[in-house]
């Protein structure tokens, strides 16, 4: 089924000039960019995005990280996009990420892992509404 999903190239990926490399990974796997914007996440958006982590010991570090500098928000579209993107990204921790995945290639840590992607079709819809209210 054709799906849409959100990918965030996090501040560490933007700071390291990896936007083009990362987008190529998705496009080379048949996914299409349908929306893209470079933006600085506000604390309000970051807190909504990471609301499931509120109260956890890493929450403030996560909010500070995602709001420190611009990120690149993208909507990708393609066949089984949600699962395919997560496979292309690899495991959250670079030490667990399979060879050839974005996180294996570019991530520095579990937090500075370059990318976020929607984990379900439902969360993709919610994240599109959050990050792309104009769409």
Regions found by a protein language model. Give the residues of each.
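Non-catalytic terminal and connector segments of soluble metabolic enzymes
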Residues: 1-135
